[in-house]
Amino acid sequence: MIVPKEKIEEAVKQALSKENNPKRGFTQSVELIIAFKDVDMKRGDIKLREAIVLPKPPSKPRNVLVVPSLEQMESAKRAEPNVILSKEELQKLQGAKRAVKKLASKNQWFLIAQDSMSLAGRILGPSLGPRGKFPTPLPSSSDVSEYILRYKRSTLVKTKDQPQTQTFVGTEDQPSGDLAENVFAVLNSIEGKIKGPAYIKAIYVKTSMGKPVQINLK
């Protein structure tokens, strides 16, 4: 365990306080920042690209774009993703750079039927890559509703060339205890992939426009 849950909740409460989080005219995201030490990112000491299901779903689900197969279409609709496209509709986006960029900006996850993955890579890839996003293949089963629902409550933890990662863990209107559970779930999921707590320099919680609050690791 990297840090006890009660210390996480203490930091979450501070991050949500008026002192650190002045009221805005919209519901802010709550983010977790993990800074690493004694690692060489260019050498690949830490490589993270993990989809982690949040145990306490955010009040607003993650936006998911889905391109199901014909057999998966009805079950995909039941999950009510943000955007659902047929393979033919995806094909029609070829060359529509503005529309593709808009889809890339507004959605967090891109779940694609396996027979449409190469097409999605060609059409969506150029807009997804610079945003740190990527197509994820749907399973081959005909019922993909539960799979899509899981991604509507999932967050992405990824690293690039900097020794840190920043990820969504909920929204400011959630109870602090729920947010703490989500932070705990993320830390628990990546603990085995970062060579242990000794490589963590600091962990912070913050709202999207608020001040970061450091979690006490001692």
Curated annotation (Swiss-Prot):
Q: Which Pfam families match?
A: Ribosomal_L1 (PF00687)
GO CC terms: large ribosomal subunit
Tell me the name of the encoding gene. rpl1
Assembly and partners are described as:
Part of the 50S ribosomal subunit.
User: PANTHER family per the record?
Assistant: 54S RIBOSOMAL PROTEIN L1, MITOCHONDRIAL, LARGE RIBOSOMAL SUBUNIT PROTEIN UL1M
A Gene Ontology biological process noted in the UniProt record is: translation
Q: Output this protein's name.
A: Large ribosomal subunit protein uL1
Q: What is the superkingdom listed in this entry's lineage?
A: Archaea
The entry's keywords: Repressor, Ribonucleoprotein, Ribosomal protein, RNA-binding, rRNA-binding, Translation regulation, tRNA-binding
